[in-house]
Amino acid sequence: MPTAPVSTTPAADKAAEKAEVKTYFESTGFDRWNRIYSTSDDVNKVQRNIRIGHQKTVDNVLAWLQEQGELGRRSFCDAGCGVGSLAIPLAQLGAGSIAASDLSEAMVQEAERRAGEAGIAPCRISFLASDLESLSGRYDTVICLDVFIHYPQQPAEEMVRHLAGLAEQHLIVSFAPYTPVLAVLK
């Protein structure tokens, strides 16, 4: 006997998308992205290109922030911090306060571990496992790098609007468009 199609609401769809991303980053995704953002040679060509591109983006953002001056007087939110690729060097440059969050508890734990290895005192970066929509507070600069590839366009647009509301001065966002091809290759 055929089953009736299940109707869902936009809120249910959004919750399902978020749960799917979270589950991915607590398992296979954590292993994959932790390896990409490490110095391991155990990456394929696409992953190596992602690593190189991400590092270029981080370097460009850090250079721009330094050009703005007074890092020590400014507050930063690294939304979707992953393993700390931006938050850690930002702390090393003397940034005032840094709130770094990621949907994945595993990513946050790895970021904390890497910060400790880099000699960053725990009080220098406030790490939090949180989805982007739940972030609150006001920051001079909110930065969200390479997160939105994991979301369809509509939820990504809503997240950008939310992050813009947290930024006093600057919102810095980078992304690759979500496409089925990129989703498979990542």
Feature locations, PLM:
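Short, glycine-/aromatic-enriched active-site segment of Class I SAM-dependent methyltransferases
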Residues: 181-186
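Conserved beta-strand signature within the Rossmann-like core of class I S-adenosyl-L-methionine
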Residues: 167-177
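Short catalytic micro-motifs in class I SAM-dependent methyltransferases
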Residues: 146-147
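A short, conserved alpha-helix within the catalytic core of class I
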Residues: 151-162
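N-terminal, positively charged/glycine-rich alpha-helical extensions of SAM-dependent methyltransferases
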Residues: 2-41
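Class I SAM-dependent methyltransferase SAM/SAH-binding core
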Residues: 77-79, 85-129
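Conserved alpha-helix/loop element of class I SAM-dependent methyltransferases that forms part
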Residues: 51-72
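A conserved beta-strand element that flanks and buttresses the S-adenosyl-L-methionine
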Residues: 143
